[in-house]
Design a protein with these regions (language model features):
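Conserved GNAT acetyl-CoA-binding A-motif
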Residues: 114-124
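Conserved beta-strand in the GNAT
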Residues: 59, 65-73
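Conserved beta-strand-loop-alpha-helix junction that forms the acyl-donor binding cleft
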Residues: 123-132, 151-155
């Protein structure tokens, strides 16, 4: 692993939406979920920078080029009675992997969580993504085997809401 001294992490700006959107598509292709992506630059801009932002993002630049992003938001733990930081997505472009950028992004987010008084920092990982699981565990994360994600979208969500 070689660290590029020109790598810098900063909060995303509206000018970064195009880069983040393209990396979201790259991530979806990698996760074999590209058929689920309906995100547009306009919707992403609204979610990050609209009147009621739903999330935040940071980007990492190498030699002035945006090569990684992390999108995150706050949740709340009833057990801890503290808010948490939830990492929705972290992505490093294929051409820039193995340089330590992912770990630097995670460490940056961990610092944000501590600075904001969060009781935990969480994210999900696909069970087949062994390299990511190993990476996260090497960073001190506990992969929780007893938990499963429950999700309701589309027509089932509408039916549940009517029900």
């Amino acid at each position: 692993m070689t660290l590029d001294t020109t790598f810098a992490i900063r909060p995303a700006t509206p000018a970064d939406v195009t880069h983040i959107q393209s990396m979201i598509v790259e991530l979806a292709v990698f996760e074999k979920l590209e058929h689920l992506v309906v995100a547009t630059e306009e919707k992403l801009h609204e979610g990050l920078f609209g009147p009621h932002p739903a999330c935040e993002a940071i980007v990492g630049e190498a030699d002035g080029e945006v090569v990684t992003f992390a999108l995150f938001f706050h949740n709340f733990s009833t057990f801890l009675t503290k808010r948490g930081l939830y990492l929705e997505d972290l992505y490093v472009r294929q051409s820039h992997r193995g340089k330590g950028y992912g770990s630097r992004m995670l460490k940056h987010l961990a610092r944000l969580a501590v600075e904001r008084g969060c009781g935990r920092f969480e994210w999900s990982v696909l069970d087949w993504n062994t390299p990511a699981i190993n990476f996260y565990q090497s960073m001190g994360a506990e992969v929780m085997p007893d938990w499963r994600i429950c999700r309701v979208t589309g027509a089932p969500l509408e039916a549940l809401a009517q029900g």
